[in-house]
């Protein structure tokens, strides 16, 4: 799923990604905290661009990012 400022979210895909994150995790609570922490980071990162209204909420964006990282670990730096 391509994440851009002007795209809309496929809610079924988002639900599947969230379910996959939780299903593959060993601790549902920590997964939820990771999603919330990433969303908080993204919210403050996007704070500078207040004039650009994003159609994707920070929690939705964090689920997509964490799901992509889980499914494609070779894309991670380091």
From Swiss-Prot:
EC number: 2.7.7.6
Record field: catalytic activity: RNA(n) + a ribonucleoside 5'-triphosphate = RNA(n+1) + diphosphate
Keyword terms: DNA-directed RNA polymerase, Nucleotidyltransferase, Transcription, Transferase
Coiled coil regions, renumbered to chain: none
Annotated Gene Ontology cellular component terms: DNA-directed RNA polymerase complex
Pfam family name, one: RNA_pol_Rpb6
EC main group: transferase
Superkingdom: Bacteria
InterPro entries xref list: DNA-dir_RNA_pol_omega, Pol_omega/Rpo6/RPB6
GO MF term list: DNA binding; DNA-directed RNA polymerase activity
GO terms, biological process: DNA-templated transcription
Primary role: Promotes RNA polymerase assembly. Latches the N- and C-terminal regions of the beta' subunit thereby facilitating its interaction with the beta and alpha subunits.
Subunit structure of this chain's protein: In cyanobacteria the RNAP catalytic core is composed of 2 alpha, 1 beta, 1 beta', 1 gamma and 1 omega subunit. When a sigma factor is associated with the core the holoenzyme is formed, which can initiate transcription.
UniProt family annotation: Belongs to the RNA polymerase subunit omega family.
Name of the protein: DNA-directed RNA polymerase subunit omega
Organism for this UniProt entry: Prochlorococcus marinus (strain MIT 9515)
Taxonomic path: Bacteria, Bacillati, Cyanobacteriota, Cyanophyceae, Synechococcales
Gene name as annotated: rpoZ
């Amino acid at each position: 799923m391509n994440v851009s400022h002007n795209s809309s979210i496929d809610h079924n895909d988002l639900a599947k990604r969230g379910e996959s994150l939780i299903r593959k995790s060993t601790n549902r609570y920590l997964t939820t905290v990771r999603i919330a922490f990433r969303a908080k980071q993204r919210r403050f990162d996007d704070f500078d661009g207040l004039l650009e209204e994003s159609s994707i909420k920070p929690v939705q964006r964090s689920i997509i990012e964490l799901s992509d990282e889980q499914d494609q670990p070779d894309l991670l730096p380091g």
